[in-house]
Amino acid sequence: MKQINRVFTVFAVLALLVTVNSFAARMDTHMSSQFQGPKANTGTVTHFAENGKSILKVSADFKVPDTPAPTWRVVDSKGDIYTLDAFKIKGTLGTNAEKREVEVPSYIKDIAKVQVYCAWAQVLLGEASFSSPIK
């Protein structure tokens, strides 16, 4: 009986540590200003770290522009622009899905702005800024 209690105690402590760790990781979030632009002008973007990876995620009220190739772009504090993934991805049976979250590659040292860019027309659709660059 004592052994079972010890096992349950160990599992409870481990579960608590995992919960606290994931909660602490989510506490370190950064929210941008609202998107401003001709086609992308709703919602915000949030930056957070998850499992050691830098993640950007648009808010629920963000509407992906109805353009041929809306794409995630990141601008760093030096003004360098990095093109990431497309917002629209092909789903099953010809349907389209939205990529509302993207991993930021480790070679990007900081994030000052997030842009929505039409890769087909090569035009900026909107952008959102952080109050200070995120490292």
Predicted regions located by residue number:
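Short, exposed beta-strand-loop hairpins at the edges of beta-sheets
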Residues: 103-129
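Beta-strand signatures of extracellular beta-sandwich domains
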Residues: 71-75
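Solvent-exposed strand-loop boundary residues in beta-sheet-rich modules
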Residues: 76-80, 120, 134
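Bacterial N-terminal signal peptides
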Residues: 10-19
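Transition segment at domain starts
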Residues: 23-52, 87-88, 135
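An anionic, turn-rich surface loop/hairpin at beta-sheet edges
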Residues: 80-106
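Short amphipathic, basic-aromatic surface patches that mediate peripheral association
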Residues: 56-62
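Bacterial N-terminal signal peptides that target proteins for export
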Residues: 2-11
